[in-house]
Amino acid sequence: MIRKRRKITRMRGSRTVGGGCSKKRRGAGHRGGRGQAGGHKHHWTWIVKYDPKHFGKYGFKRPQKLIKRLETVNLAYLDEMIPELLERGVASEEDGMVVLDVRDLGFEKVLGSGRITRPVHLKAYEFSRSATEKIEEAGGKAEVIE
C-alpha cells in the first residue's frame, strides 16, 4: 500500500511548486522552442553534435519502375496441387509427364522451395536455378516462355 503524499499536496503554498522561476514554466521559451525548432538557428550546435545527418539526402533509392515484381510460386505448392489441377483441366498429361502452364494460375516465376515427386513439364516466364535443377532431376522439363 502506497503511503507517500502527493507532490502537489506537499508543495501547497510554495508559489512555483518546484518549477524554479515562474517565467520558466511559461510556454516553451525557456527551452528555446518545442522539439526541433531552431535547428537551423539557435540549436544548430545541438544538430551538428547529436544529429549530423538531420539535413540533406543520404543513401540511394532504386527507381521503382526498374524493380521487377513477379508473382512467384514454389515447386512444393505445384506438386501438391497437380492432382486437383488435372481434375479441373488446367493441367494435362502427355507421355507420362504432367504439362502445366503456370501463367494460367496467375504466376510468372517458379521458385525451387520444396521437392517435386513426379516428372512435370512447366511453362513460365522465369525459373530459379534451383527450380530448374529439381524439375530436371525428377525427369521433367522447365520451358521458358518469352
Curated annotation (Swiss-Prot):
GO biological process, one term: translation
Gene: rpl15
InterPro entries: Rbsml_uL15_N, Ribosomal_uL15, Ribosomal_uL15/eL18, Ribosomal_uL15/eL18_sf, Ribosomal_uL15_CS
Recorded family membership: Belongs to the universal ribosomal protein uL15 family.
Source organism per UniProt: Methanothermobacter thermautotrophicus (strain ATCC 29096 / DSM 1053 / JCM 10044 / NBRC 100330 / Delta H) (Methanobacterium thermoautotrophicum)
Region (Disordered): 1-38
Top-level taxon: Archaea
PROSITE patterns the record matches: RIBOSOMAL_L15 (PS00475)
GO MF term list: rRNA binding; structural constituent of ribosome
Coiled-coil stretches: none
PANTHER family given in the database record: 60S RIBOSOMAL PROTEIN L27A (PTHR11721), LARGE RIBOSOMAL SUBUNIT PROTEIN UL15 (PTHR11721:SF3)
Residue ranges with Basic residues bias: 1-13, 22-38
Protein name: Large ribosomal subunit protein uL15
An example Gene Ontology CC term for this record: cytosolic large ribosomal subunit
Subunit note: Part of the 50S ribosomal subunit.
Entry keywords, A to Z: Ribonucleoprotein, Ribosomal protein, RNA-binding, rRNA-binding
Function text: Binds to the 23S rRNA.
